[in-house]
A protein has these predicted regions:
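Proteins synthesized as precursors that undergo proteolytic processing into mature forms
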Residues: 180-182
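Glycine-rich ThDP/TPP pyrophosphate-binding loop and its adjacent helix/strand module
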Residues: 185-186
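Thiamine diphosphate
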Residues: 3-174
């Protein structure tokens, strides 16, 4: 940590480096004195592990599952899924479209799925709210589609004092009437 702090603050002068190293050391000393040591020792893993962001994993999983059409409107934090598809789709034979809004994204994947193409979109809470009429349309026509809701930490763009999976309630009750749906949430 000390080396990282030195590298990060070197251009700001030795006094800034010393202050940051001192604060980090004081925090470490306080924690060591005030808290018990964590009793679990993780075994070393001799095999390197791949690390992916959640949005990358969504894209990779969708491609592995045979998705051949992806349409979306960029909405944080789901935009990374669109970026992943845009960067990798050509090599995988996947058609990608950035459309004018979330309503268009939902309806265009319904059209693609009606032709037998595995189709998907991703959005976040506000975007999914706009898609709910299309959810009902897909149910009425019995056309299977995949809609990913990359949840924010709370209402709107999130609440700084708490986190939740608030979009889950919206997804569970999306559209009108009862129809089969598969909802997966961590």
């Amino acid at each position: 940590l000390e080396e990282s702090l030195k590298a990060r603050f070197a251009r700001q002068g030795q006094s800034v480096v010393d202050e940051n190293v001192g604060v980090a050391q004081a925090g470490y000393d306080y924690a060591a004195k005030s808290f018990e040591t964590f009793p679990v020792v993780l075994p070393e893993n001799p095999h390197p592990l791949a690390q992916w962001a959640g949005n990358e994993a969504i894209g990779m999983g969708a491609a592995a599952a045979g998705v051949k059409f992806y349409a979306a409107y960029p909405m944080s934090p789901s935009t990374g899924v669109l970026h992943w598809f845009a960067q990798n789709a050509r090599d995988m034979g996947i058609m990608v479209r950035q459309v004018e809004d979330e309503i268009a994204a939902a309806n265009i994947i319904i059209g693609a799925a009606q032709t037998g193409t595995r189709a998907m979109t991703a959005t976040s809470g506000g975007g999914f709210a706009l898609m709910t009429e299309a959810v009902g349309a897909a149910a009425m026509m019995e056309i299977p589609v995949v809609m990913v809701d990359v949840q924010r930490a709370g209402p709107s763009t999130g609440v700084p004092t708490k986190t939740e999976q608030g979009d889950l309630w919206q997804v569970l009750g999306a559209s009108h009437g009862g129809f089969p749906r598969l909802i997966v949430a961590p």
